[in-house]
Amino acid sequence: ANADRLGYRHDFTIYDASDSLSLIKSIIRELQLDDKTYKPSTVQAIISHAKNALIEPQAYARNRELIEMDTRSKRPLIHEIYRIYRQRCFVSGAMDFDDLLLQTNILLRDCPDVTARYQEQFKYILVDEYQDTNYAQYVIIRRLSQLHSKVCVVGDDAQSIYSFRGAKIENILSFKKDYPSAMVFKLEQNYRSTRTIVEAANSVIERNSKRMEKKCFSEGDMGEKIRVLRAYTDREEAEMVVSDLRDKVRAAGDEWAEAAILYRTNNQSQALEDALRRKGIPYRIYKGNSFYDHKEIKDLLAYICLLYTSPSPRDRG
């Protein structure tokens, strides 16, 4: 809606990350730039950061700090790639994901009637994971809430881990300043972790210079002492985890079904599976697929088996 106010068709196209990267690659080739210096994914990330900071191509080119930073990194033409990229997207009637935020801000900034309409439509605004919002999202929320100031946000400044994607911790830290009449409810009791873990987390986070004052606590068991294992590779880490698990299961006389390994990302499973297989430990993966059950891996293993088991011409003769 309202895309026509920005010069776009109402049925504009949305470029995903792959579409965006392809366009950036073609621009780098056209400008005859070295794609090792101007790595497309790096250029894409820089443009994304600029948009999330509401910096348009013209402003980027005039920003001495950004230009000096690009020059030091031997990429002085980032601003030109950004300008061409923005122009190509516009001519093609397309926006990428970051444009959806940037163009929304431009719309709310330049079209007061649109802003007034949406302020009435969205009198109450609820934002989850507020600590992960970027500057562009912050400004949208501020503009929409300017009339009624009825904003509820949920977040934890101690869990802000997406600054590399443009998240601004200042958004949640300045919430009371932005909305002076807002009430703050601190959820300080932890129902999941042992007291040892909560106290350790408190001792680390209290060293932050920029934080909201709170003291988390747990009424659960004290739990085991925290151990830190240092590993240099994912394979070494998996070996340490599996060896430790095996020793504990044997010492306690438990069944393997009573043991579990929790991991955060799916790509960690392969190293763990390999370590379990090497030690002959049976396992099942819950709510996910084994690395060796992926179709492409099964196909590849089948080809390898075929190569090893097929008789050679000499054997057939």
Regions of interest found by a model, annotated:
Residues 2-16, 28-38, 65-72, 89-93, ...:
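Short, polar/flexible loop-turn hinges at active-site or ligand-entry regions and domain interfaces
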Residues 308-317:
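Single conserved hydrophobic/aromatic residue that forms the stacking wall/gate
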Residues 159-162, 287-307:
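Short alpha-helix plus adjacent loop in nuclease-associated cores
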Residues 51-59, 94, 149, 204-214:
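Proline-centered turn/helix-capping motifs that create local helix->coil transitions or kinks
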Residues 69-174, 189-193:
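Conserved helicase NTPase motor core
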Residues 180-183, 188-282, 295, 307:
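Helicase P-loop NTPase motor core
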Residues 1-14, 21, 92, 115-116, ...:
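P-loop NTPase Walker
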Residues 1-46, 55-59, 229, 243:
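Conserved P-loop NTPase-based nucleic-acid remodeling module centered on helicase motor cores
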